[in-house]
From Swiss-Prot:
Listed PANTHER family: N-(5'-PHOSPHORIBOSYL)ANTHRANILATE ISOMERASE (PTHR42894:SF1)
Species whose genome carries this gene: Methanosarcina mazei (strain ATCC BAA-159 / DSM 3647 / Goe1 / Go1 / JCM 11833 / OCM 88) (Methanosarcina frisia)
Broad class of enzyme this protein falls into: isomerase
Protein name (record): N-(5'-phosphoribosyl)anthranilate isomerase 2
Gene3D superfamilies: Aldolase class I
Catalytic activity, EC: 5.3.1.24
Length: 226
């Protein structure tokens, strides 16, 4: 079970997430929609530089141009990129040619069962998928605080050949159930881990990581017994 804390906006929050047991942090750079989590590339670079060992900084971007994304990857020094845009297969192939060793995660919004058909062409060019919730009313494509239909996500996990990360309204209170229902490769939370000032709350992060790991091992043990 891999755990990502997204929407990191301070060095101290990145360090805290690492010490709480997160495997990755998300740095949201390259804005096209509404979000409180966007930071500029210079702050992202600083956070990447000061990340502790054994944690992966992920560039989360809404840009869809391969050249622009490549520029951000180069300048920030991230090892993974998460695409929240209408990137084409060809754009991802182009990005891969420039950075052959980078991990590429493609976002899809779970708006109905048909989403799996949109995902299929990307299976051969990405390293993983992330499933999130769309909030058109507030012009948000991520960090919406809204859950989607986990039964669809569960079906996607079974039918695609790439690892699937679950996002969308996850909190310390519901992450265990989400893992039991969906059985994803990883989970990703942002808004559900914030304090009243919009930064990451340490106790929420601790509880999220603990419950995610705990319920994953319960699911894993059951599968091994069967």
């Amino acid at each position: 079970m891999r755990i990502k804390v997204c929407g990191i906006k301070r060095v101290e929050d990145a360090v805290m997430a690492a010490y709480c047991g997160a495997d990755a942090i998300g740095l949201v750079v390259g804005r096209k929609h509404n979000s409180d989590d966007f930071i500029d590339k210079h702050l992202a670079q600083k956070i990447v530089r000061e990340c502790p060992p054994y944690i992966s900084p992920v560039l989360v971007t809404e840009l869809d141009d391969a050249e622009e994304i490549s520029g951000l990857v180069h300048e920030t020094g991230v090892t993974s990129v998460q695409l929240h845009s209408d990137c084409t297969v060809d754009s991802i192939i182009s990005l891969r040619k420039t950075f052959p060793n980078i991990k590429i995660i493609k976002n899809f919004h779970v708006i109905g069962p048909g989403v799996i058909h949109a995902m299929k062409p990307f299976e051969s060019v990405v390293d993983a998928f992330i499933l999130d919730t769309l909030d058109l009313a507030n012009d948000k494509v991520g960090s919406t605080g809204l859950v989607h239909d986990w039964s669809i996500s569960r079906k996607i996990v079974k039918e695609v050949s790439r690892p699937v990360i679950l996002a969308g309204g996850l909190t310390p209170e519901n992450v265990g159930e989400a893992i039991r229902v969906v059985n994803p490769y990883g989970v990703d939370a942002s808004s559900g881990l914030k304090d009243s000032n919009g930064f990451k709350d340490e106790m929420k992060v601790i509880n999220f990581v603990h419950r995610a790991k705990n319920d994953f091992f319960k699911v894993r043990n059951l599968s091994l017994e069967n």
